[in-house]
Amino acid sequence: MKITNTLLNAAALLAVTEAATITKFFTASTQTLFVTQTSQTVVATKSFVETIYSAPPKQLTSKTQDSTSPTTSSVNSLTSSSATSYVETTTPAPSSSTLTTSTISSSTASEDSDATPTADVEFAEEILKEHNVKRALHGVPALSWSNKLAEYAQDYANTGFDCSNLNLKHSGGPYGENLAAGYMGGISPVDAWYDEISMVDWNNVDFTESTGHFTQLVWRSTTQVGCAKMMCSTAWRQITVCEYLPRGNVIGLNVTSGHSYFVDNVLPPLK
């Protein structure tokens, strides 16, 4: 009888233990019980573009003024406190993050202009052609290719970006500069920049943060371009860097013409 009672007690203990386990399982939160997982990884691609704006060069001083370099889609600009002290020259203002005004001889405004790109000929020909296709729509002269600008662009494309946490930050060099990420080849970056035409107010052509790539692209007094690309992360794909000389997006009054630099250099499409 004692053995029977012992066996019954053991069986009861086992039943309680199993019941407790079952109770714990079925009272678990639904968040724990129902976890779904996708069987296929989807890679999202990203893209954005960036440009810079600068004040026109000032002839009578060599004072440097600091300015915060733009990031993501924001841009900054500098306007003259005295528009009449600025005159149009063929020399670009020297920096995106630091805007410098100085007396520069016009002979320094020209970089080497070479018909044959030094690297990635197919990309260079494609992106130069697309620049000039867009410029022709506005009746402004075609750009010529500069190996020096392209080499500068390539150096910055190779060293200026962290693909694990991409931030399109400008080089701060002496040229106009357009940046893009996520657009492949030589045509799609230019098309993305040109698409900003839809946001231009042709009754009041001026600086805006949303149209700077377009205005640099068609800037009449710009004569040379050099571009480069760098393959980045899977998400961002290609980074595109284009350098321009003389640089565009100059803010201020051209005392020679009596118009703003934007009115003189950003022309509406031909009809």
UniProtKB/Swiss-Prot annotation:
SCP domain span: 128-244
Name of the protein in question: Repressed by EFG1 protein 1
Keywords associated with the record: Cell wall, Cell wall biogenesis/degradation, Glycoprotein, Secreted, Signal, Virulence
Biased composition (Low complexity): 67-118
Induction: Induced by ketoconazoland fluconazole; and repressed by EFG1, RIM101, SSN6, and alkaline conditions. Enriched in the media of yeast form-containing cultures. Expression is also regulated by HAP43, SEF1, and SFU1.
Any Pfam family hit: CAP
Family: Belongs to the CRISP family.
GO molecular function: cholesterol binding
Gene this protein is translated from: RBE1
Keyword Glycoprotein: yes
The keyword Signal is annotated on this UniProt entry: yes
